[in-house]
Amino acid sequence: MPLPDFHVSEPFTLGIELEMQVVNPPGYDLSQDSSMLIDAVKNKITAGEVKHDITESMLELATDVCRDINQAAGQFSAMQKVVLQAAADHHLEICGGGTHPFQKWQRQEVCDNERYQRTLENFGYLIQQATVFGQHVHVGCASGDDAIYLLHGLSRFVPHFIALSAASPYMQGTDTRFASSRPNIFSAFPDNGPMPWVSNWQQFEALFRCLSYTTMIDSIKDLHWDIRPSPHFGTVEVRVMDTPLTLSHAVNMAGLIQATAHWLLTERPFKHQEKDYLLYKFNRFQACRYGLEGVITDPHTGDRRPLTEDTLRLLEKIAPSAHKMGASSAIEALHRQVVSGLNEAQLMRDFVADGGSLIGLVKKHCEIWAGD
């Protein structure tokens, strides 16, 4: 399928996607009943969309195009109410978190969807292992060239986005020692990590044409980059965050990305170059492994900075943009999080350290989501 032309969209508008866990009480393992839930709610959703993701234990909540995070929060809140009621009617529960702490990937059923079945044929068991749960944020752009500039700018802050949203310390019944283990699942995919370097939309079109020669890439949706342009929506899509435990934190993360995008495209503070990516995977690893306690390294100077310190600097820089976008409350909440040193991954570990079981942890996450 050829790459579509870049659809011009209103700059800085938002679209947010949350991949949620569908679980079976009282054992709180992943369910395989998302299709049943979707059928139950599809005619009751008035704004946004509830749809499938890769496997039958995943449920995706997606907003419509929103002008700001308050509109997005309203849509999510309405969807959440409908989904929770349907889940209760079917003796299921819903929660966030980037991974389910003890599910077995071998048990996961790939959705009966042509695209997902084709992906299963291409990638085999890797697709079942990709039963992990992330937050994706789309930001509108006026042109393809703006999208490429924005993608490179946002890529500088991938460690910050990962650290602030880290919520996947447990996987397959084990403490991984990572704050965010979810991104590691995609490391075996040939398109993992950052997008290959291009400097404008014309070069991106040539890149996509080259990738399509492999026959594994039929559309932009088949690419698993950390950040990717979405020409059919006219957006740049940030894909590195774990699904938070609360709707409020998901909205705050979207506000952060919207405000950062506004700052990048209005101030144009960077002259991007391929060398910017030399230490990308090392800095990304620091955020995944240590969260905000990680250290990032500047590829141009060799300077090493605590991620906590650099995140506070970012929040300060984008504060005026956040005000213009109506996202100041999000930036203030994230600032409090960084200063406190708390994140969801550590809260999960604290629960287990205090004697809680992994089953109890999932139950707690369901209570948190339902009570938010």
Curated annotation (Swiss-Prot):
The keyword ATP-binding applies. InterPro entries: GCL_type2/YbdK_subfam, GCS2, Gln_synth/guanido_kin_cat_dom, YbdK. It comes from the Bacteria. GO terms for biological process: modified amino acid biosynthetic process. It is an enzyme of class 6 (ligase). It holds the Pfam family GCS2. Its EC number is 6.3.2.2. Keywords: ATP-binding, Ligase, Nucleotide-binding. It catalyses: L-cysteine + L-glutamate + ATP = gamma-L-glutamyl-L-cysteine + ADP + phosphate + H(+). Gene3D superfamilies: 3.30.590.20. GO terms for molecular function: ATP binding; glutamate-cysteine ligase activity. Belongs to the glutamate--cysteine ligase type 2 family. YbdK subfamily. NCBIfam families: gshA_cyan_rel, PRK13516.1. ATP-dependent carboxylate-amine ligase which exhibits weak glutamate--cysteine ligase activity. Homodimer. This is Putative glutamate--cysteine ligase 2. It comes from Escherichia coli O139:H28 (strain E24377A / ETEC).
